[in-house]
Curated annotation (Swiss-Prot):
One of its GO terms (molecular function) is serine-type endopeptidase activity. The gene is clpP. The keyword Protease applies. CDD domains: S14_ClpP_2 (cd07017). It comes from Streptococcus pneumoniae (strain ATCC BAA-255 / R6). Keywords: Cytoplasm, Hydrolase, Protease, Serine protease. This is ATP-dependent Clp protease proteolytic subunit. Its EC number is 3.4.21.92. It catalyses: Hydrolysis of proteins to small peptides in the presence of ATP and magnesium. alpha-casein is the usual test substrate. In the absence of ATP, only oligopeptides shorter than five residues are hydrolyzed (such as succinyl-Leu-Tyr-|-NHMec, and Leu-Tyr-Leu-|-Tyr-Trp, in which cleavage of the -Tyr-|-Leu- and -Tyr-|-Trp bonds also occurs). Belongs to the peptidase S14 family. It is found in: Cytoplasm. GO terms for biological process: protein quality control for misfolded or incompletely synthesized proteins. It comes from the Bacteria. The active site is at 96 (nucleophile), 121. Cleaves peptides in various proteins in a process that requires ATP hydrolysis. Has a chymotrypsin-like activity. Plays a major role in the degradation of misfolded proteins.
Length: 196
């Protein structure tokens, strides 16, 4: 169930679903697994807000365990494509593909709530049963290219070397807000709503 909020206007009352009301304040919620439908919704909202006013920041609240690499990279590419700065605010967690998205916010405008967590790791992949060896080799090569692409983005976003990111992402690597700040994925830990 999606909550509804009611606003008083000069013409009376107007009701909105909560996400439409937040969008009016340039807030986008990126929550749950990253998949194509969710990514398309986030991308549409980014494009809409940028077309509406590209001089005002967009606030992207992130709480995701990660998910589809292609869907996540579509979000990241759109964040970089639009003119408006995208502030990212991690609440709960940004894991896996979520770290790539959250760390791709505008430099100086990447935030995290005090009890949120970050997690980086190498991308996962697999082949279904009955897969031919040649197809397995192609899938393995693609997975290595994908890992390199993601680690390059994470290195650029954090200021760490590719070698360090590669080593740190070898297994699930959970980070507290303070550790995430020290690593360079965020710019500030927020204790209260001080966004402007």
């Amino acid at each position: 169930m999606i909550p509804v909020v009611i606003e008083q206007t000069s013409r009376g009352e107007r009701s909105y679903d909560i996400y439409s009301r937040l969008l009016k304040d340039r807030i986008i919620m990126l929550t749950g697994p990253v998949e194509d439908n969710m990514a398309n919704s986030v991308i549409a909202q980014l494009l809409f807000l940028d077309a509406q006013d590209s001089t005002k920041d967009i606030y992207l609240y992130v709480n995701t365990p990660g998910g589809s690499v292609s869907a996540g990279l579509a979000i990241v590419d759109t964040m970089n494509f639009i003119k408006a700065d995208v502030q990212t605010i991690v609440m709960g967690m940004a894991a896996s593909m979520g770290t790539v998205i959250a760390s791709s916010g505008a430099k100086g405008k990447r935030f995290m709530l005090p009890n949120a967590e970050y997690m980086i790791h190498q991308p996962m992949g697999g082949t279904g049963g009955g897969t031919q060896q040649t197809d397995m080799a192609i899938a393995a090569e693609h997975l290595l290219k994908t890992r390199n692409t993601l680690e390059k983005i994470l290195a650029e976003n954090s200021g760490q070397s590719m070698e360090k990111v590669h080593a740190d992402a070898e297994r699930d690597n959970w980070m507290s807000a303070q550790e995430t700040l020290e690593y360079g994925f965020i710019d500030e830990i927020m204790a209260n709503n001080s966004l402007n």
